[in-house]
Amino acid sequence: KLVDTANFDDYMKALGVGFATRQMAGLTKEISFKLDEEFDETTADDRHVKKLILTLTMGNVVSTRTYPTTI
């Protein structure tokens, strides 16, 4: 569980992480979900989508987003 992000930007900068990626990292938030159950998500650009998170073998995780269709 994330407790503190003090100096995280400086840390990423020291690792050579680019500006845009560092800015996106600052937008991360904790989520709670159950595997194989779809849930609502709001993307970083404020779109509302359905998301499904599936697991694969060897600890790899795959997620899919379903964007609403407009007519």
UniProtKB/Swiss-Prot annotation:
UniProt-listed SUPFAM superfamilies: Lipocalins (SSF50814)
Any single biological process term in GO: long-chain fatty acid transport
Molecular function per GO: long-chain fatty acid binding
Alphabetical keyword list: Lipid-binding, Transport
PTM note: The N-terminus is blocked.
GO CC annotations on file: cytosol; nucleus
Keyword Transport: yes
Signal peptide extent: none
Domain of life: Eukaryota
Similarity comment text for this entry: Belongs to the calycin superfamily. Fatty-acid binding protein (FABP) family.
Described purpose of this protein according to its UniProt entry: May be involved in the regulation of smooth muscle contraction by transporting polyunsaturated fatty acids (e.g. arachidonic acid).
Protein name: Fatty acid-binding protein, smooth muscle
Gene for this chain: FABP
